[in-house]
Amino acid sequence: MTDTEFLDHAEKLLLAVEQGCDRINDTTDADLDAQRSGGMVTITFPNRSQIVINLQKPLHEIWMAAQSGGYHYRLEDGAWKDTKGDGEFFAALTRDASRQSGMPLVFSAS
């Protein structure tokens, strides 16, 4: 994958995260604050915990840091998959955001 292809796919992921936060805020009382700065999105929860998602362009990876730990994802077969085999990005974001918010939240690629 070229750098340009990576950036195209990664931008779609970051946009889906931002739109997911907006949708969640419109339909729940979660009160997520999503801030975008270049290739990074920081989601802050009312309890002040955060999830940080950022691009690692040289590695063609997306990194996510949450209270549960740090995770690295690569695009494989159209999905962002954990480099250690621990699942897919949006499933992990859903899991960690739900834990950190204390309520069920759902993120998806679309």
Curated annotation (Swiss-Prot):
Transferase listed as a keyword: no
Record function comment: Involved in iron-sulfur (Fe-S) cluster assembly. May act as a regulator of Fe-S biogenesis.
Entries under InterPro entries matching the protein: CyaY, Frataxin/CyaY, Frataxin/CyaY_sf, Frataxin_CS
GO molecular function, one term: ferric iron binding
Protein name as annotated: Iron-sulfur cluster assembly protein CyaY
SUPFAM superfamilies, sorted: Frataxin/Nqo15-like
Keywords for the protein's UniProt record, in alphabetical order: Iron, Metal-binding
Domain of life the protein comes from: Bacteria
GO terms of biological process kind: iron-sulfur cluster assembly
Pfam (any one): Frataxin_Cyay
GO cellular component, one term: cytosol
Signal peptide location: none
Family matches, as SMART domains: Frataxin_Cyay
Assigned protein family: Belongs to the frataxin family.
